Curated annotation (Swiss-Prot):
The lineage of its organism: Bacteria, Bacillati, Actinomycetota, Actinomycetes, Mycobacteriales. Residues 162-183 are annotated as: Disordered. The 12 identical subunits form a hollow sphere into which the mineral iron core of up to 500 Fe(3+) can be deposited. Homododecamer. This is DNA protection during starvation protein. It comes from Mycolicibacterium smegmatis (Mycobacterium smegmatis). GO terms for biological process: intracellular iron ion homeostasis. GO terms for molecular function: DNA binding; ferric iron binding; oxidoreductase activity, acting on metal ions. GO terms for cellular component: cytoplasm; nucleoid. Belongs to the Dps family. Keywords: Cytoplasm, DNA-binding, Iron, Iron storage, Metal-binding, Oxidoreductase.
Length: 183
């Protein structure tokens, strides 16, 4: 740990910001691994479109993890990018859908994005009074995460605006319902 932080930011605020950003770093590391898992395990009609749609998002999220880790270091703290850090910071269950259809994976992935975006927005609110530069970083990330969720949802939405997995609160439940609706 260093004995400095950013000029104009107290050590206490820097520590609070770094703690928030550490959780975000773990979220991004978990998300890019989950996206690769989906990329490798999606099957069925529309496979190639979804398979190829996911890789750019993986790279984007990996980039977000790097930006957040570098911001933590800039604050004079040590970013933790280990599997143990992901598990320690995790407030969600491990992604549970294995080899499955496009619809099943996308429905489960939509719920993953719900959690990531909700947590990111909470961090954005908390950063309002702590560090506007870090807040700005997460605001930019949130916009892109929301756009990608829209890409996912476009595959799941009916002409009437209903999602195939509406009402489901678990990835498995969402995947099961989407699979049944697409059969």
């Amino acid at each position: 740990m260093t004995s400095f932080t950013i000029p104009g930011l107290s050590d206490k605020k820097a520590s609070d910001v770094a703690d928030l950003l550490q959780k975000q770093l773990s979220t991004y590391n978990d998300l890019h691994l989950t996206l690769k898992h989906v990329h490798w395990n999606v099957v069925g009609p529309n496979f190639i479109g979804v398979h190829e749609m996911i890789d750019p998002q993986v790279e984007l999220v990996r980039g977000y993890a790097d930006e957040v880790a570098e911001r933590i270091a800039t604050l004079g703290k040590s970013p933790k990018g280990t599997p143990g850090a992901i598990i320690k910071d995790r407030t969600w269950d491990d992604y549970s859908v294995e080899r499955d259809t496009v619809q099943a994976h996308l429905a489960a992935l939509d719920l993953v994005y719900n959690g990531v975006i909700e947590d990111t927005r909470k961090s954005i609110e908390k950063l309002e009074d702590l560090d506007l530069v870090s807040q700005d970083l997460l605001i930019a990330h949130a916009g892109e995460l929301e756009k990608f969720q829209w890409f996912v949802r476009a595959h799941l939405e009916s002409a009437g605006g209903q999602l195939t997995h509406e009402g489901q609160s678990t990835e498995k439940g969402a995947a099961d319902k989407a699979r049944r609706k697409s059969a």
